[in-house]
């Protein structure tokens, strides 16, 4: 044959191209349409209760069963505080071992979590709380003093929650329920959620 430019040569056969582009990239999985995060998490706990679920920065670990106990304690405290489906619950929690139990606990209780940076000034925190309508705020020890300055808002300290007794009925969480509200800085400088 005649001369061809290097860019015109195909280094792969049709079968190799099919294998690399289509077969190896066929990673999609059917997702159960009626699944919720609390349901999927509970299924994982049931399958692998002793497996490591959370690695902490200090080297500590939590198994799925241990994480589930913390999640249930958060959910029970929120249900006892009157949190219902789609109700917003603010999280004044730093990134770390308390954040995941807080998120999953809010969702298990049927609420929607609203993460708020605990490093924000008090007035900004108050503005976000007012805007999102959260009646309940979860705080970690780092944000405990900030939580004391929130007036009428019910503040629950994650490190002080009692263990779950299992007395409260589970929330009926549905796929269409609100899961979270995220605030952005907004183009005007006012947060938008």
Language model features: what each stretch is:
Residues 1-17, 24-193:
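Carrier-protein-dependent adenylate-forming modules in NRPS/ANL systems
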């Amino acid at each position: 044959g005649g001369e061809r430019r290097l860019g015109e040569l195909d280094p792969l056969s049709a079968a190799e191209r099919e294998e690399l582009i289509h077969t190896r990239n066929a990673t999609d999985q059917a997702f159960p349409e009626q699944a919720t995060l609390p349901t999927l998490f509970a299924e994982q706990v049931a399958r692998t209760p002793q497996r490591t679920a959370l690695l902490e920065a200090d080297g500590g670990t939590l198994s799925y069963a241990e994480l589930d106990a913390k999640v249930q304690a958060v959910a029970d405290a929120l249900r006892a505080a009157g949190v219902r489906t789609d109700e917003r619950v603010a999280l004044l929690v730093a990134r770390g071992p308390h954040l995941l139990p807080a998120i999953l606990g809010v969702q298990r209780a049927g609420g929607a979590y609203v993460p708020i940076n605990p490093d924000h000034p008090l007035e900004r925190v108050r503005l976000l709380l007012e805007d999102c309508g959260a009646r309940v705020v979860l705080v970690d020890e780092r944000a405990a003093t900030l939580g004391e300055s929130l007036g009428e808002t019910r503040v629950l300290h994650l490190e002080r929650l009692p263990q779950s007794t299992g007395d409260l009925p589970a929330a009926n969480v549905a796929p269409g329920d609100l899961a979270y509200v995220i605030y952005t800085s907004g183009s005007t400088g006012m947060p938008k959620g």
